């Protein structure tokens, strides 16, 4: 995990989950989005941007262990676990940017591990008489998803419904999806990348400063 030390006017949590690390399309496009957001909130009169703090999690470079019995036991005993840090990073963020490739119709296992650690009763959601309630409200989430084929709005896209359900369970309901599709199809890759970049530019333009 790396942190760029800047003032906390806006805190952006950037999570990359591509197995290819920084070389993955979802990583490159999500970085493009973070850079544009950073520039949007930059102080044009300052030599150094003091208006944005970026906290980055590269799950390929620094894998998070999958949730196991030992971790669950430690949580129950009130002992410190890695999820404490991950949850605090999420709570501190004003904006969350997720780079999420589609692997075998689902999310990367590293991202699923991150999800399992941040979903904790009493911290990111709570149980009530009427059902669970998410505790992470008033945060903007951007999901940049890359796919080899075309799945958007099709029955084969089980990834986005899962992401919407999981994020919404935590109270993260203000979610924008950016799609880069057709990346493994002959003659379609460049258009897929261009469409995603255009969507990023449009969304950043709409983001309130």
Curated annotation (Swiss-Prot):
Catalytic reaction annotation: 2 a quinone + NADH + H(+) = 2 a 1,4-benzosemiquinone + NAD(+); N,N-dimethyl-1,4-phenylenediamine + anthranilate + 2 NAD(+) = 2-(4-dimethylaminophenyl)diazenylbenzoate + 2 NADH + 2 H(+)
Principal EC category: oxidoreductase
Pfam families in the cross-refs: Flavodoxin_2
GO molecular function, one term: electron transfer activity
Classification via Gene3D superfamilies: 3.40.50.360
UniProt keyword annotation of Manganese present: no
Listed name of the protein: FMN-dependent NADH:quinone oxidoreductase
Lineage: Bacteria, Pseudomonadati, Pseudomonadota, Gammaproteobacteria, Cellvibrionales
Name of the gene this protein is made from: azoR
